[in-house]
């Protein structure tokens, strides 16, 4: 459960990355592919897996924009993320463990780029991404 302090830290962070979703998203996704090459199997149409690849940039931006959009829905993540959970769980059949792997790559990318990524912010981001991961995995049960 996110505390009010966590929510404030998340909102501040998400506002700061709003204009950088393509760059940060592409790097996080490329990091996922490099560190966990088995995840490439979910992207058969991708011809490249670097942060400079057009499809990596596009998909990475989609993911980070979706996270930024949760800024308005921190008190109702289950409802807000339901369609994405259904798409990934029932349509794309993504192994839910991959959400945790990608969350870790997102956190590392944010830490590498944002001076504001204090220990307190790191804790809030971990809790937030853990909650997002839980909600995206919810329809697998």
From Swiss-Prot:
CDD domains: Hb-alpha-like (cd08927). Heme b binds at residue 88. Red blood cells. One of its GO terms (cellular component) is blood microparticle. One of its GO terms (molecular function) is peroxidase activity. PROSITE patterns: GLOBIN. O2 binds at residue 59. Signal peptide: none annotated. GO terms for biological process: hydrogen peroxide catabolic process. Involved in oxygen transport from the lung to the various peripheral tissues. Belongs to the globin family. This is Hemoglobin subunit alpha-1. It comes from Torpedo marmorata.
